[in-house]
């Protein structure tokens, strides 16, 4: 709850403290945090490839972030900026807008920021601004939990919670000591307070501290630098999924597979200044990614779990990305209504909203006998409505991603890989041409493990299976043309786009026939006729039939991360969960430098690919990733073998 001092300066009623100096909050930020971390001098000499990463404890009104954004503009052509902030009690758009209204210098930046400051979820929320030059990760939650969830090291730290006497939880000894897990030699910090307990905790964590003149009426402030050359790893991370940082600068990457995973990854890497070779024998999005239309919404579970946590994060970033990237004719936020079904029963859906603490801005429950966007059509249909559920045309998005500068498409089959010093060679079967790159990333659907297996005596370490899906398109009827939202139940129906609906999709793990089958078309028609009889669809409405073979993992989450030797994994971790080894320290998993996989997206290719590509790009460059470390563990390529050795 906010009050306003002189109707200008925001004051927290909960902590009885001001958010920024009433004298000049913007100049205070520059003095304490920008100059306190020597950012102007450091930015002038920064590496052009790696993002400069700042961690802030206490987002508040966003003043520090927007001021940093403004000061960074002079350097935006030299490097990217990644700003991570933690906030337990976030302000809404109106409160932030009013709080920052006194700073005329920030008007345009504030406008761009607030246009994306929506659909927030507990935990990590990832944004990009300034055409991908600025990455922003906002963690909503407790600071002690958040620090254990940041995967990566930062370059500077802004400590800006309310005063220690007002908000002791943020300045707790354990919180400040955990800063070592996100620090590396040369990481700096600054803060407005010089309280003794703060200095003692930071010194204990490995920071060399120095007092400096404070801002305005504050006599002193504190700056520091992390002096330990040893990289502390988060003790909560399991040894088999601890990150390995690149030993060399990455300049070239070969991506095998030009579906939606490969093309979105090519886009993410090329925007970081990396030369990308994109390889596929069929062309861009010519296999399963070539479906005419895909729909996306988060997957709600009754209690927060791996699938719901990942898909919520992926959904909100996909919305943000596509809103600025996609042309109007291949992306639209129509909203999506999901009816109650046997699998998605009313308790699961309602408890899912409650337990994930989702606002009505994201999703709300529609009870029976209530009106809806489509008039009386769904009046007696209970379910949930995702306000920004959307449809896309995957092939169009994939092609636009592949057209970016720095992406070279090569039509051909990757037939052999071998290490060449610090690089990798990849042979193109048709031409005999060899591609040399610092890294190879396998995004080739259900063939993801085939080339890798040659390194491990033929063993494919990733359990990906084919799942057949068939969809059909339907000519609109007079009544169906009025539907404005995507409708989901056991199958889904899109609104009419240019006179055509998409009705999908079947799910078959056993019949892998690549050709359309009448029985599947009949099954889909039977569904839509029984579920929505008033729409008057019949067999004469069928326009096209399309089949795709999804690449799916046993837990229906993508495989994303470094390649490892499964033989070594079994040797090292085969007894990791035995009671006798409870206190034993196991070595970190040694991954194969320069080899990565990104696949197994299943039926959520569009939903997963945009955030997945950003995660992968961050891993390859050794930067903080835009999801929690616990979510990263859900996606790790070694998770299946870990589960197997535990049995």
UniProtKB/Swiss-Prot annotation:
It is found in: Cytoplasm. Residues 256-647 are annotated as: FAD-dependent cmnm(5)s(2)U34 oxidoreductase. Its cofactor is FAD. Gene3D superfamilies: D-Amino Acid Oxidase, subunit A, domain 2 (3.30.9.10), FAD/NAD(P)-binding domain (3.50.50.60), Vaccinia Virus protein VP39 (3.40.50.150). One of its GO terms (biological process) is tRNA wobble base modification. Catalyzes the last two steps in the biosynthesis of 5-methylaminomethyl-2-thiouridine (mnm(5)s(2)U) at the wobble position (U34) in tRNA. Catalyzes the FAD-dependent demodification of cmnm(5)s(2)U34 to nm(5)s(2)U34, followed by the transfer of a methyl group from S-adenosyl-L-methionine to nm(5)s(2)U34, to form mnm(5)s(2)U34. This is tRNA 5-methylaminomethyl-2-thiouridine biosynthesis bifunctional protein MnmC. The gene is mnmC.
